[in-house]
């Protein structure tokens, strides 16, 4: 039985330094039928880059996008306390910098705040160590590259291993878990991973397509 596929457009690849161009790119995505946005937040410490604060969340909400915020920060609870008054639908964070207890408390806090909650894992993280936490997640993001920058090459071997592991965990303890792949996504990667993945996150590759609708249609056809 094939899985229903979704596509999230990663704002990390958008031209955020040029407001007009950024808005044009958003319009292009919206007109192509893509309703989901992946909104990376980076502190420059958890990953070697800095990205988005809250500046675009209200506009994305007004435009009708479903927004998944992804914290790549060392203090996710502090960031959530700031972000929680802004409109978005889902939130994931990297659990590696904090204790498992604090990660569990944050997952519960996110859900209590009315959002879907998830964890995002770096390629070399041992997923089995986070099995008990995954039970409390609505979704999990598997990174196909080292997080921080867009346009990287897909890490095939380790990512396939992680996708198999997270699917095994899903079957065992959380059958409704949504599995998301973020990083290195292209047509070949989608074909290779389609039986493991529900949602693909694409930025650089998506914006390179002359017709973004073709990528969306391709994902839904797999």
List PLM regions with ranges.
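Conserved N-terminal beta1-alpha1 strand-loop-helix module at the mouth
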Residues: 1-90, 98-101, 109, 117, ...
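Alpha/beta catalytic cores of nucleotide-metabolism and tRNA/nucleoside-modifying enzymes
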Residues: 168, 172-181, 186-190, 194, ...
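Short, hydrophobic beta-strand segments that form beta-sheet elements in well-ordered domains
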Residues: 117-121, 179-182
């Amino acid at each position: 039985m094939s899985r229903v596929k979704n596509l999230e457009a990663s704002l990390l690849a958008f031209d955020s330094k040029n407001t007009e161009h950024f808005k044009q790119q958003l319009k292009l995505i919206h007109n192509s039928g893509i309703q989901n946005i992946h909104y990376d937040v980076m502190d420059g410490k958890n990953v070697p880059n800095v990205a988005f604060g809250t500046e675009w969340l209200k506009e994305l909400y007004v435009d009708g996008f479903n927004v998944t915020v992804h914290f790549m920060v060392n203090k996710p609870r502090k960031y959530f306390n700031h972000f929680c008054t802004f409109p978005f639908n889902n939130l994931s964070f990297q659990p590696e910098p904090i204790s498992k207890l604090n990660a569990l408390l944050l997952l519960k806090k996110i859900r209590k705040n009315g959002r879907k909650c998830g964890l995002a894992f770096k390629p070399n993280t041992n997923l089995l160590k986070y099995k008990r936490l995954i039970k409390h997640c609505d979704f999990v993001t598997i990174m196909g590259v080292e997080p921080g920058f867009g346009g990287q090459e897909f890490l095939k071997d380790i990512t396939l291993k992680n996708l198999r592991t997270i699917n095994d965990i899903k079957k065992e303890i959380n059958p409704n878990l949504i599995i998301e792949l973020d990083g290195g996504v292209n047509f070949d990667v989608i074909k290779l991973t389609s039986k493991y993945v529900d949602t693909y996150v694409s930025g650089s590759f998506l914006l390179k397509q002359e017709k973004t609708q073709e990528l969306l249609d391709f994902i839904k056809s797999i």
